[in-house]
C-alpha cells in the first residue's frame, strides 16, 4: 500500500520563500498576490533565465514553475532548484 504524504501547515516551515516562474504576467501576478495572502514571501520570474538567476541568489523553499516558457523549458529552472536546495517543494 502506498502511503499518502502528510499535509503540513505553512506555519510549520521556517522558510516561506516561494518562487513563481511563469511568462503569463497576469496569471503570475494573481497567483503571487494570493500566495502572499497565505503567508508566503513571493519572488516572481518571467523566464528561464530570470528564474535560474533568482534561484542562484535566493534558493527558494517552494516553487511553482511553468514548464513551457518563451525562452526555454521550465525544467531547467527545476534542475537548478534541485541543485541548490534538495528540500524545495516544486510544482
Model-derived features with residue positions:
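Residue-level signal for the "D+5" position in two-component response regulator receiver
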Residues: 44, 69-72
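Acidic, metal-coordinating helix/loop segments flanking the phosphotransfer/catalytic sites
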Residues: 44-62
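Non-catalytic signal-transmission and effector/linker regions of two-component phosphorelay proteins
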Residues: 1-19
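Acidic catalytic/metal-coordinating carboxylates
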Residues: 47, 73-76
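Short amphipathic alpha-helix used as the core "switch/output" element in two-component signaling
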Residues: 53, 75-87
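Two-component/phosphorelay signaling modules centered on CheY-like receiver
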Residues: 25-43
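Active-site residues of response regulator receiver
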Residues: 66
Amino acid at each position: 500500500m502506498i502511503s499518502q504524504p502528510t499535509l503540513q501547515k505553512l506555519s510549520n516551515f521556517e522558510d516561506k520563500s516561494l518562487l513563481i516562474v511563469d511568462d503569463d504576467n497576469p496569471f503570475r501576478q494573481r497567483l503571487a498576490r494570493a500566495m502572499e495572502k497565505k503567508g508566503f514571501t513571493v519572488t516572481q520570474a518571467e523566464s528561464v533565465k530570470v528564474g535560474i538567476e533568482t534561484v542562484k541568489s535566493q534558493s527558494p523553499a517552494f516553487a511553482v514553475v511553468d514548464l513551457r516558457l518563451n525562452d526555454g523549458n521550465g525544467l531547467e529552472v527545476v534542475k537548478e532548484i534541485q541543485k541548490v536546495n534538495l528540500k524545495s517543494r516544486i510544482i
